[in-house]
Amino acid sequence: MILNTFAKNKEVLVSRGELVEIGGSFRVPEVMAQSGAILKEIGTTNKTHLADYENAINENTSMLMKVHKSNYSIEGFSSDVDFEDIVKTAQQNSVIDYYDMGSGHMIDLPFNLSQKEPSILEIMKYKPSLLSFSGDKLLGSVQAGIIIGKKELISKIKKNQLLRMLRVDKITLSILEDNLNSYLKNDLDDIPTLKMLFTSLETLENRANSLKEKIDTICTAQVLETQTLIGGGTTPNRKIPSFGVTISYKDFKPNKIEKLFRQNNLICRIENEKVLLDFRTIQENEIEQIAN
């Protein structure tokens, strides 16, 4: 939508290291081609400098675009350009700056998860032209694409003929409104994703022990420390501490137990040849149901 509105038949500068592919084989180059924008790759896979943007700007440049690497990371001899510098360069050259944030968040996340995930509020301090991010993921609301930015640019997007087909319905908007109100009230327990992220290890251990006590007579259960991947196209390769319960039963192989659990809507994983229930995603009111 953004690219089609502002960059049709014009160049958009993107770092080679940010030409991402997300789930379902959706790729930045293909999305750009569909919009009518002309992709101009700059820098290299592992290193892109501000000078790469500055040297590539010409009379047909419409936009400087940054894409957050939300589902992979490049380590070692690598660097990219801070969005703050991209904003300044875009303004100096009278072009649009745009940040596809992927999974932006609104508050400081636990376990230093905010370190490599862009903060919506922090990025807004740079007074960018346009930002986009997901309504679900770390924001913790409905699945939707959210665009914020300068009023005159948003007004132009609203006039794009594609908007009629892509706009969300009133139910989606009402759920999103309720979610954002929870942020304003600082009531994180109303946002399941954040509630799970912020649950203390002590609480998780207590829940795990509670389940173990309920099922000890019918199977072999053990409480242990484990690590949780956030997943969902966010915080690549980052794990946070958690507690889990491993379960074994008679001569049942782990794969069979896992299959039986999934048939009853209980998602688990196999770790060290044992079925593991991760209590980072299990609530207090679900323990009795799992035991049964």
Can you name each region flagged by the protein language model?
Residues 205-283:
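Conserved C-terminal alpha-helix-loop-beta "cap" of PLP-dependent enzymes
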Residues 94-98, 135, 166-171, 186-192, ...:
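Flexible, glycine/charged-enriched surface loops at secondary-structure junctions
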Residues 1-181, 216:
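Conserved PLP-enzyme active-site core in the AAT-like
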